[in-house]
Amino acid sequence: MQLSLTQPCFSGTLLMLAVSTLLLWEQVTSAPNYRMSTGSLYQRVVELSHYTHDLASKVFIEFDMKFGRTVWTHNLMLSPCHTAAIPTPENSEQVHQAKSEDLLKVSITILQAWQEPLKHIVAAVATLPDGSDTLLSRTKELEERIQGLLEGLETILSRVQPGAVGSDYTFWSEWSDLQSSDKSTKNGVLSVLYRCMRRDTHKVDNFLKVLKCRDIYNNNC
């Protein structure tokens, strides 16, 4: 099919966006993290963190617009996130008072807590009768981005505090609900998970911005 000269060139814009995203991903994952300076690694994980949170927000909005009417919104808003038990700074003052290694550890713990759920989320979205290819591809991408971000943070922590590791947090009990044949139950769990993922990626993004400003620019930013 031949395109007319007046047809909007959306394909070019989408291609540029895709290339930009791919380059950002390759910057964080192509070369071993130990070869980068800590400053460069901070810069790249902050960029990846911001992108990951933006992606999580888009996925949540897309899911809510398509499936929001099939879930009980009031009850879901009261449902706690599975990461709620992870102790984190509650406000800006506590974030700035926290030690760098502690902010890194809690960020790692939050991301680790999403590794297992994301595997089940991807499988559940793949079987949604009314799901879209975009929702599935974005969810898969979230899984990859969070893994890349986790690896970058673990490298930074190993430099800030050699031998330190984040707390192991793997408790998650709702995977069986994602396999439910009841549409409302399944969509309800997905809605909570996408909402919580948006919340947690935003929290990690804020922590990393503080760390970058403090540890790389001595708070002159």
UniProtKB/Swiss-Prot annotation:
GO molecular function: hormone activity; prolactin receptor binding
GO terms under cellular component: extracellular region; extracellular space
Alphabetical keyword list: Disulfide bond, Hormone, Secreted, Signal
Signal peptide annotation: 1-30
CDD domains named among the record's database cross-references: prolactin_like
Domain of life, source organism: Eukaryota
GO biological process, one term: mammary gland development
S-S pairs: 81-196, 213-221
InterPro entries to which the protein is assigned, alphabetical: 4_helix_cytokine-like_core, Somatotropin/Prolactin, Somatotropin_CS
Localization (cell): Secreted
Family classification: Belongs to the somatotropin/prolactin family.
UniProt name for this protein: Prolactin-3B1
